[in-house]
Amino acid sequence: MSEALKRMAAEYRANAGLLLKRINELKSELAQTDCKTSDWTRLRGRIMILEILYADSISTARYLENYHGGN
């Protein structure tokens, strides 16, 4: 794997770590929020979007880590 791909994969993993940290912060806040409020709905929506971004970041990092080039 080229150094550029290694760096890119590391950046995606680092960003995924930041996303996961924020997801966990929001989940903690969600647990303390009444589920019958618009705040709960808003938080749940933000968490769902961040979870998608997290999954995409991990997927991209794995792809870059395992890319061998095609012929």
Residue ranges and their predicted role:
Residues 1-21, 44:
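Short, charge/polar-rich alpha-helical segments
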Residues 30-41:
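Charged, low-complexity interaction regions
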Residues 16-19, 23, 46-70:
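Amphipathic alpha-helical coiled-coil segments
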